[in-house]
Amino acid sequence: METLELQGAKLRYHQVGQGPVLIFIPGANGTGNIFLPLAEQLKDHFTVVAVDRRDYGESELTEPLPDSASNPDSDYRVKRDAQDIAELAKSLSDEPVYILGSSSGSIVAMHVLKDYPEVVKKIAFHEPPINTFLPDSTYWKDKNDDIVHQILTEGLEKGMKTFGETLNIAPIDAKMMSQPADTEEGRIEQYKRTMFWSEFEIRQYTHSDITLDDFTKYSDKITLLNGTDSRGSFPQDVNFYINKETGIPIVDIPGGHLGYIQKPEGFADVLLNMWG
C-alpha cells in the first residue's frame, strides 16, 4: 500500500492502473480493499485509488482523537476525512480528480465537494444515508440515536438488526453485512471496526452540515447512484429526494448497497459510461 503523511495520521491507500485519478471512499467498512475487484475492472482507464480512511485498516493515527469526536453532533471526523481526501487528491494529480463515495463514504464525498470543490472533476454519491436536509430529518436523527443507544446497551447484533430494518436494507446487502470474517482475529477486528463506526459515525455523519444548496452550485459535477438490487432502502430515498429538489440525475447501477463487491463488472461498466 502507498502512504501519505498527514496531520495526525498516516493515510494508506491502494493504487492500481493508469489514466486520470479516480478515488474511492469506503463507508462503514472503512477500508479500501473492498473496492479492489472494481479497481481491476477499471485499471486500464483510470488510476484507481482506494483509501483506508483514518482510524481504519492500515491507516494509522499519529495523534489521538479529540474527546469531542464521540459527541453525536461532532463534525470533526467527517471534516477530517474530507480534508484527507482533498489532500490525497492534490498529492496525486495537478488536475481535478474523479471521486466516488459509497454509503457514509458518499457523505464524506459531499463534504469534499462542499469544502474543496477545486479538487473535484466529477463526483458520484452512491446511496448516501444522510438525513440533514430531509423534511423528516428529526425523525431519522432520533432513529439513529436509538440505534446507537441499543448497540451500546443491548449489543451489536440487536442494534444492527434494528439498523437493517429501519433503513430497509435489501436482503442481498443484509446477508453480506452480517457475514462473519473467516478467522477469529478477523472477527475481533470486524467487531471493533463496527463498534467504532457505531459510536463515531452513525449519528455524526448522517446529520452533518450538508444542504441542498451545496449540491445545486456544483450540479454539473454530480451523479447520484442507486443500486438495482436495493430498491426501497432509505439511502435510495435520499437520492430520490436530492433528484426531486435539484434535478441532479440518478443513474441505476448494478448490485445493492454493496454493488461494487456484488457485481463489479456491471458496476464498472456504468462508471465507464459516465466518465470513461
From Swiss-Prot:
Listed Gene3D superfamilies: alpha/beta hydrolase
Entry GO MF terms: hydrolase activity
Pfam name, any one: Abhydrolase_1
Region spans: Disordered: 57-76
Enzyme class: hydrolase
UniProt keyword terms in alphabetical order: Hydrolase
E.C. number: 3.-.-.-
InterPro entries: AB_hydrolase_1 (IPR000073), AB_hydrolase_fold (IPR029058), AB_hydrolase_sf (IPR050266)
One of the record's GO cellular component terms: membrane
Residue span, AB hydrolase-1 domain: 20-137
Protein family: Belongs to the AB hydrolase superfamily.
Protein name, as recorded: Uncharacterized hydrolase SA2367
